[in-house]
Design a protein with these regions (language model features):
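Structured segments of extracytoplasmic/periplasmic soluble domains
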Residues: 82-91, 101-105, 118-125, 144-152, ...
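Noncatalytic regulatory segments and standalone regulatory/sensor domains
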Residues: 22-49, 172-234
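Positively charged n-region of N-terminal signal peptides that target proteins for export
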Residues: 1-4
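Extracytoplasmic/secreted proteins, especially bacterial periplasmic and envelope-associated proteins
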Residues: 75, 79-83, 97, 110, ...
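Bacterial N-terminal signal peptides
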Residues: 7-15
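Active-site-adjacent structural segments surrounding the nucleophilic cysteine of cysteine proteases
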Residues: 18-112, 182, 231-234
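Mid-length scaffold segments of soluble, non-membrane domains
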Residues: 108-139, 148-151, 155
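Active-site-adjacent substructure of cysteine-protease-like catalytic cores
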Residues: 133-188
Length: 234
């Protein structure tokens, strides 16, 4: 829910054949970022086509995962949910209807409890922070991530980025080593404006994400750490 208002220019995803503009609920958010924030020849960020990326050599990725960018400053949760719905072939929702159905607040965003409730009411199988033991270390977390991805299940996560931000883990790469500290997470990021390629995908260190995986507003005080959920049709 980053307060980052930019002059309206809808993003053109020239570098990702699948990436979809979603101007369904206004002209804000990452979808309104100017095209000149993208740099095909960036020396700082690799211009990987994550949509076409495949698994292998220690990497598990959900190939052809459908990316999307939020069109408001507060709808990262609805967009994360939207991509999960589309991954499993449900095209009955859009950003606007999910903002309503998830009871998204324009100031504080979307709660984990409302995300889980929405998918349960669809009749989907849902697991989340509230029904699962705390991950004690990154080894447990990495095993959890790899297991879900190997089963074709994306993982919706929220952490303190931007003061509170929903993303979806759609890939993990061990880099072919036993050392967990070089592992990379691949995210579907509804506010993907920071890597010179606004295609809806971003990468980050598994270790660094794990160390910053806590919430400022969403969860009860004794449940601030490790907000996540998985949802898939039964």
């Amino acid at each position: 829910m980053k307060k980052f208002f930019i002059a309206a220019l809808l993003m053109i995803f020239a570098n990702c054949a699948c990436a979809e503009e979603i101007p369904e609920n206004g002209e804000g958010g990452a979808a309104s970022a100017p095209a000149n924030i993208n740099h095909v020849d960036s020396i700082y960020f690799a211009q990987t086509n994550f949509y076409e990326l495949t698994s292998g050599n220690g990497r598990i990725v959900l190939t052809h995962y459908p990316p999307a960018l939020q069109t408001t400053e507060y709808s990262c949760g609805p967009i994360a949910a939207l991509t999960v719905l589309r991954w499993f072939g449900n095209n009955d929702f859009d950003e606007k209807t999910l903002i309503r159905d998830l009871k998204t607040d324009t100031k504080t965003g979307t709660t984990l409890s409302n995300m889980s409730k929405f998918f349960r009411e669809l009749g989907w199988e849902v697991h989340d922070t509230f029904d699962t033991p705390h991950f004690d270390d990154i080894a447990d977390f990495q095993k959890f991530v790899m297991k879900n991805l190997s089963e074709g299940t994306p993982i919706m996560v929220e952490n303190v980025e931007y003061g509170g931000h929903w993303r979806v883990i759609v890939g993990c790469d061990t880099m072919g080593t036993e050392n967990l500290y070089d592992d990379v997470l691949i995210f579907e990021d509804p506010y993907d404006t920071s890597d010179h390629k606004s295609d809806g995908f971003a990468v980050g260190s598994l270790d660094r994400f794990f160390s910053m995986w806590f919430d400022r507003n969403d969860l009860p005080e004794n449940k601030h750490e490790q907000p996540w959920l998985t949802a898939r049709p039964k």
